Amino acid sequence: MKDKFKGFYSPTDSQIEDAWKDGSTIFVFDTNVLMNLYGYAEQTRKDFFEVLKKIEPKVWLPYQVGLEYQRRRLDVIKDEKAIFRKIDDSLSKIDKIFENDFNQLALARRFPKLSENTKELHKDISKLVSNYKRSVKYWDDKQPCVRSHDEIRSQIDEIVSGRIGDKPESQQWLDKLYQEGEIRYKNNIPPGFKDNGKGNAKDSTFSFDGLTYERKFGDLILWKQLIDKAKESDIKYVVFVTDDAKDDWWYTLDSRGKKTIGPHANLKTEIYQEAGVEFFHMYSTSTFLESGKKILEVGVHDSSIDEASVVQFYSHLPTRAHFVRNQEQVVRPFRRRKYVGPRVVYKANPSTVEVGDDVDIDDIAKEFRKQKAIFQYMMESIRKKDKSAKDLPEDDDFNEEDEGES
C-alpha cells in the first residue's frame, strides 16, 4: 500500500537523521522564518544561525521567498520598533492613573489609611515599571532600525549566497499559475488556499522587475519553485521549514485539542510524483532548532526553542505584536524553563525587583497576578457608590507577603 499512498506515511527517525547528514538534501526556508528572526532575542538568533552554518551548503531559497523578504523586511523592523514605543506609552499611563484618578478622590482627606496604602502601592509599582523599562531599553537597543545596518540580513546574505532560485520565466508563466491556483483554492488543494482572502485586499497585487504578482498565490509560487528545484538529479531529500501553521500546509487533527500530524498528504504526494524525490519533511523553526540540536549536536539553548515556538504562535494573531492580553498564554509554554539574558526578576516582595540573568517565569506570573488583584480590588472598592470604610481593605492587606501561589 505504501507505494501507492506514500504521502500518508511519515518518515522514521533514522530517515530524518539521514536527510540531515546526506549531501543530496536541500533545506528550504519560508519567508516567515526569516521575518520572525527580527522578533527573537539575540541568543535565539545566534542559535538559529549556528544551525544554518552547519548545513550551509544545503540551504536554498526560492526566488519568491527572497522577494517577499526584501519587500517586507523594513515593515517588520518598523513594527518591532513600534512595540517598544507602545510599551513605553502604556507604562507612562500608570503614573497618570495615580496622579489623576486617585487624586480626584481626595483620599488623604476622606480615607487617610487608604491614602497611605495607595502611596505605597504607587511606589512599589513605580519600581516595577522603572526596572521593566530598563529591560525593555536593553532589547530595544538590540533591534535594528530601518536606517541602520541590518546584521540579520547580512548573515542571511552570507549563508544563501549563490543559492537562491531564479525569478519566474515570464508573466505568462505566472498567469498560468494563477489560473491553476483558482482551481486549487476552490477545491482546497494546498498550499495557500487559506490565503484566498488576500485577493480582496487593497494591496492584492504588486509589481517588481517587470512582473505582476498576486499576493494570494504567494505560497503556490513558492511551492512550484521548490518543486522545480527538487527535480534536479542530485537532490533526493527536501526539508521545508515554515512558521505557517495553517491547514493548507499541515495535516491537523482535533484529538483532545488541535494536533499537527505532519505535512499535508497532498503536498507530499505532489512533490513525490512531480520531482521524484525520496523524502519530503517539514519543520517549524522551533522543531528545526530542536532537531538540529539533537542530530548535529549544535549547542542550541532550550530557551531559543521555546521562544521560536511562542513567536510562531503570536505571529498568527491579528496584530504582530508580542503584547499579551492574557499573560497565562505566554507563561504556559515556558513552565519550568529558565531564560538566559537580561530580564526583569520579580521577587515575592514587589519592592525588590532587579534586572538579572535568570528569570523564573512562575515568579513573574505570580507577581503579576498579585499586583493585578490588589489594584483591581482598590479600584472597584473606591468606585462603589457606597464609600463606607468597612468595604475597604486594612493596611496589612496591602503589605503582606505572598508566600504561596495566588
What does each model-found stretch correspond to?
Residues 239:
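Nucleic-acid nuclease catalytic cores
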Residues 242:
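Short beta-strand/turn micro-motifs composed of small residues
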Residues 3-236, 246-365, 378, 382, ...:
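Active-site-proximal, substrate-binding regions of enzyme catalytic domains
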